[in-house]
């Protein structure tokens, strides 16, 4: 299977790329460190369009949501089944005034609002008849380069658990 992953160089995106590659899947990695920018929505969507699965992981303002719409609409004419996994956050379940550890209140609200935008778009598209199958993934505290809380789930274990629940060809 050909799989596009935004933000594949660090954190959860990197772990998805590693584990899926180890399972024999071809990874199309899209990352700022490779000179890509998901804010260039049409260009990024053109890299994703030939793939079977899009793991929509990277966040850059509201580009993650814009990219979801763009890819979903590009895949509509196809009869083949495609998949989009949107990586959101459990923070969307929190009280709107909750502060994320390590972020200011303003940064916490911006992050939550961007992910809520993604979730609303996800539910809107998921409700429509389509050959594009959607999955929303809401990680809680996952131990990555950015989050090192001792109570957090190790990123390799978290991704392994997500993948064990999926049927990938």
Language model: regions and residue ranges:
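Conserved hydrophobic beta-strands of the Rossmann-like cofactor-binding core
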Residues: 2-5, 54-55, 84
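N-terminal Rossmann NAD(P)H-binding glycine-rich loop of SDR-like oxidoreductase domains
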Residues: 4-23
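Adenosine-cofactor binding site in Rossmann-like domains, unifying the SAM/SAH pocket
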Residues: 27-46, 59-66
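Well-ordered, non-membrane alpha-helical segments in soluble/globular domains
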Residues: 41-42, 53, 62-73, 113-120, ...
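Local beta-strand N-terminus motif with an aromatic residue
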Residues: 50-51, 81
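Catalytic loop of short-chain dehydrogenase/reductase
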Residues: 59, 63, 73-128, 140-145
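C-terminal helical subdomain
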Residues: 130-137, 142-169
């Amino acid at each position: 299977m050909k799989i596009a992953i935004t933000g594949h160089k660090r954190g959860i995106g990197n772990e998805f790329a590693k584990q899926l590659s180890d399972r024999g899947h071809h990874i199309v990695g899209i990352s700022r460190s490779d000179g890509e920018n998901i804010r260039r929505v049409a260009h990024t969507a053109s890299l994703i369009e030939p793939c079977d699965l899009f793991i929509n992981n990277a966040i850059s303002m509201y580009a993650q949501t814009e990219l979801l719409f763009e890819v979903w609409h590009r895949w509509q004419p196809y009869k083949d089944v495609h998949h989009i996994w949107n990586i959101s956050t459990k923070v969307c379940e929190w009280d709107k005034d909750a502060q994320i550890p390590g972020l200011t209140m303003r940064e916490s609200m911006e992050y939550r609002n961007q992910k809520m935008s993604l979730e609303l778009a996800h539910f809107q598209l998921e409700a429509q008849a389509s050959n594009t199958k959607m999955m929303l993934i809401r990680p809680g505290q996952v131990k990555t380069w950015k989050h090192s809380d001792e109570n957090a789930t190790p990123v390799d274990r978290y991704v392994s658990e997500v993948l064990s629940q999926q049927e990938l060809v």
